[in-house]
Amino acid sequence: MHTDTTRENPQASAPQAADSSQDLAATAPGQLRVIKRNGTVVPYTDDKITVAITKAFLAVEGGTAAASSRIHDTVRRLTEQVTATFKRRMPSGGTIHIEEIQDQVELALMRAGEQKVARDYVIYREARAAERKNAGAASDVAQPHPSIRITRADGSLSPLDMGRLNTIISEACEGLAEVDGALIERETLKNLYDGVAEKDVNTALVMTARTLVEREPNYSYVTARLLMDTLRAEALGFLGVAESAPHHEMAELYAKALPAYIEKGAEFELVDAKLKEFDLEKLGKAIDHERDQQFTYLGLQTLYDRYFIHKDGIRFELPQIFFMRVAMGLAIEEKDREARAIEFYNLLSSFDYMSSPPTLFNAGTLRPQLSSCYLTTVPDDLSGIYGAIHDNAMLSKFAGGLGNDWTPVRALGSYIKGTNGKSQGVVPFLKVVNDTAVAVNQGGKRKGAVCAYLETWHLDIEEFLELRKNTGDDRRRTHDMNTANWIPDLFMKRVFDDGSWTLFSPSDVPDLHDLYGKAFEERYEYYEALASYGKLKLHKVVQAKDLWRKMLSMLFETGHPWLTFKDPCNLRSPQQHVGVVHSSNLCTEITLNTNKDEIAVCNLGSINLVNHIVDGKLDTAKLEKTVKTAVRMLDNVIDINYYSVPQAQNSNFKHRPVGLGIMGFQDALYLQHIPYGSDAAIAFADQSMEAISYYAIQASCDLADERGAYQTFQGSLWSQGILPIDSEKKLIEERGAKYIEVDLSETLDWAPLRERVQKGIRNSNIMAIAPTATIANITGVSQSIEPTYQNLYVKSNLSGEFTVINPYLVRDLKARGLWDPVMVNDLKYYDGSVQQIERIPQDLKDLYATAFEVETRWIVEAASRRQKWIDQAQSLNLYIAGASGKKLDVTYRMAWFRGLKTTYYLRALAATSTEKSTINTGKLNAVSAGGNDGLQAAPAAEPKPAPVPQACSIDNPDCEACQ
């Protein structure tokens, strides 16, 4: 809010500004401050929280508890938790009302299982509140409320303009049902004090509104609009367009702001000067300012913190200008670039489709690194190994996610001819890769993220499985990077048939790396025979089931290595004629060929399924239009992209792969009133992906007509009229019907497309379903193909903490007269689950089952139906409640048996770990910290399952490499 201070607060005259050292500390920038009940502001200190918690324990356990080290440790830990909560919420400092601190103390006590102490603390607070109320009649209430003056940037004091404050709140609430502007105003004034900085008034508005989200999801839109007011004042003022602006003036101001933004951006070398060559007047008129209103708070705050272009900390890129900048960057090589820019802008700004974060970060800038994923193969020589690590650093520097194939590197104990010595194996090099990934900062946005792949026959595989363990020699551990097992079908057959399995060094069996299917089986058995005859000394024979059991055990305990399947990735690859898929990528959805001359690159984007459900059905006409434009945008990325290593450019120009995916699958089910765990959900997964596949292949054929087929088209499966659904049959034939069961049904007429694709297609690969962690937040929909994690939780990420509540659940509960404060508290008590809330009907319990309440078989089956239509793969997380070795065994066998190419994270809870957090006993704005980031499993016994990971980058809560 840009505050016009011409009107005084009518409530009272202003007191003199204080000048004590405490007051100076309380108003220092970047500090946490506490507003006391009498309106004075003091510095935030841990000591008073420690005293309050200690008194609460002493009241329950008696005075002798003061000497207990247990009490001291507990109090210290709880104090740290409370302080950490506020620092996460307000990393740049801010003001906290004393009541909010007490709310957090109460919550911390209950989460720690100290129910007796918490109950006593609640009773104490209520008693003190009653005392204040009685005393207030004679003192506090009798005194006039002091007026509030704000401190401007130049240090001058001016009265707070209550009229302006009211106008901004009213505008933020306009058109939204069941939100209370007067409540926001009252609560905001509680968090203001005399002499408050102008920017802190804006912050107080946002912080106040966001605490109300748990009561009513529409407050998320209110909060976003209040933040938008701050952003507009910041950006428009910097651009010299206006000091501030109400929403209804933005249509005119956006048209003025766009050319001013392009001019400033080019001047500061933050955007490409070529953007000045566009018809900016035409583009400015095409901007739809009403689309500013569709952001949730999480979405806009994410963009504000990490995406909008800024100079010296000042954001001067408004949301619609941000989308137009990306659109212009993607249209820069188009013939009719204005028309294409408007087409691309409309797709992005409507949230019908969203490009991946690297594209959003960098399109239209001087360094347009727009690609999400890179895959490399590491050769078996020292210069090649360190060359690959160098490539990792260069690719990661500009926000790419990496998948490295380490299978060619010889195993521990292998002979090295050049030195007449023995190899130390793969693991020491992976330690270097790990440390490089941590060291490389991706444009200041996130640390590097990498996944190392190793085939299951590699002699180092057993040590590879243990890389993420917290015990053992730390020199042979990689705590900060991901690992994945690249599993041939023959190994899975041996597991099913209870056979043995032989481990080799790739230096002795070099051709296995490039073989798959029956050819691999024949050659592998040949090498097994050589080993049995004593002609291959360096090998090891194990029972396949024992190795499988260890793979699952490590996956459960450490979260790694992920299980991915070599043969379906290769047998169904359209590009078998020019190479081999040796690994997947960081997020396990990309399956492209790699070799010493080619680093595979893939550009990602995702269709928002929610926006394509109209009147409870999939709008295929709109979907076709969206897919056509999306594929064009993805294809454009290939030519515009900045390539930091030549092998990446070589690969991308030859094959032109792209990865079109989806997000909002769970929300699309809600709109159709379909439970995730149902045959109807599987049918929707099948039919929606079939339609997207059809339209995407068709769109790529259209581009081939216009621009030509990709260079290596001849000889591909496409050139033979073999579509993804057809390659599924090849997998069945090679693997054997005994080991696979997939649905091959079709609902569309594919014959014309089979014929057409033989004439040419623009892209070697077209579809891949990425995790969409960040862009789903931006658009306000459920992530990718994920089931809902919790119906109410606090999401913590680099932008702070955000209460997330399922708006569809709230809608349905309201319709049945069940939405009230008690229901909010019940949802908190049961960690966002509805299953144990008795008054919720069974049909809603089925519809709003959360991830661990949906049987894993439904997730696998839906993924299997999608996979038959996709030429690449899916980032598929598997959720297992009551996890056991048997459940993991059944789940991952089923994933392979159903023809899946890859799996991603295992999110496992042991039998007793669905532990409730706490109930809101009063007015706490504090709910279970969860979501797809942050759940810590609490199993009954060792071994413990790995914590549910925050994201694919181990030390970063919002991986932006793959969305």
Sequence positions of predicted segments:
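Catalytic alpha/beta core of large soluble enzyme barrels
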Residues: 268-302, 590-593, 634-639, 743-747, ...
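Acidic, low-complexity intrinsically disordered tails
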Residues: 2-24, 130, 134-138, 913-963
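Terminal amphipathic helices with adjacent charged low-complexity linkers/tails
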Residues: 114-116, 120-125, 220-258, 487-488, ...
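Core structural elements
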Residues: 77-82, 104-110, 196, 211, ...
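Function-dense linear segments that define catalytic or interfacial modules
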Residues: 309, 322-341, 345-369, 375-418, ...
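Internal maturation/activation junctions in enzymes
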Residues: 626-649, 653, 675-772, 842-845, ...
